[in-house]
Amino acid sequence: MNSHNITNESLALALMLVVVAILISHKEKLALEKDILWSVGRAIIQLIIVGYVLKYIFSVDDASLTLLMVLFICFNAAWNAQKRSKYIAKAFISSFIAITVGAGITLAVLILSGSIEFIPMQVIPIAGMIAGNAMVAVGLCYNNLGQRVISEQQQIQEKLSLGATPKQASAILIRDSIRAALIPTVDSAKTVGLVSLPGMMSGLIFAGIDPVKAIKYQIMVTFMLLSTASLSTIIACYLTYRKFYNSRHQLVVTQLKKK
């Protein structure tokens, strides 16, 4: 295995890449200098904290701490997903249920099949990958669902007036929203290895692992990303479409205003 380590000095020199981005922003008057500095500073602090937390959890190797960390990851993913729901109020609970269930089922299958072991060194990184992907998919699902409901209010009202239930009136919108949310994950699976070398595969190869073995892990990652994204978006969409209707099965127009 490759024993090369990144020193603090080399990391400081790599910071020059950020300076390049800042210079481009300044030259082109993009006004992103503060955002770049803030995002980089925040990323450094967050990663340092997470690094020490993970080091402690890995050394303790406690099942309850591992589960707690997985729930914390799902909590943060749900919190960020609901912030992207521009047209849906109070979507955190739905997001948390969707992402936690999707990630939980996927992790359970991976552990029971022997693909990974229930140890923090394997469970936590995998949970981070699938929860992050589910977060993006659920956010896209919310946005698409809200936009479609707003643009098709008249058609929905007509269906309701003809006796359709909210589920029947929203069926096409739900299907299209789930489909739109899954397209990035599906497209990524189509081009994996051809357009880009994904994170896990690149990391393993960089660490000196045999590329063929790294590919097996990446195939597993592709499977789990598709599974979690599908489960999470379906659950999220079916939990949130009801928010556009009241107890009398009427479309709540006031709730459709963009926040």
Curated annotation (Swiss-Prot):
Q: Which UniProt keywords apply?
A: Cell inner membrane, Cell membrane, Ion transport, Iron, Iron transport, Membrane, Transmembrane, Transmembrane helix, Transport
Membrane topology for this entry?
Multi-pass membrane protein
Instruction: Indicate the transmembrane segments per the record.
Output: 6-26, 36-56, 57-77, 92-112, 118-138, 192-212, 219-239
An example Gene Ontology CC term for this record:
plasma membrane
What's a GO biological-process term for it? intracellular iron ion homeostasis
Disruption outcome: Mutant exhibits increased sensitivity to H(2)O(2) stress.
The subunit structure is: The complex is composed of two ATP-binding proteins (FetA) and two transmembrane proteins (FetB).
Name the UniProt record assigns to this protein: Probable iron export permease protein FetB
Q: Which organism is it from?
A: Escherichia coli (strain K12)
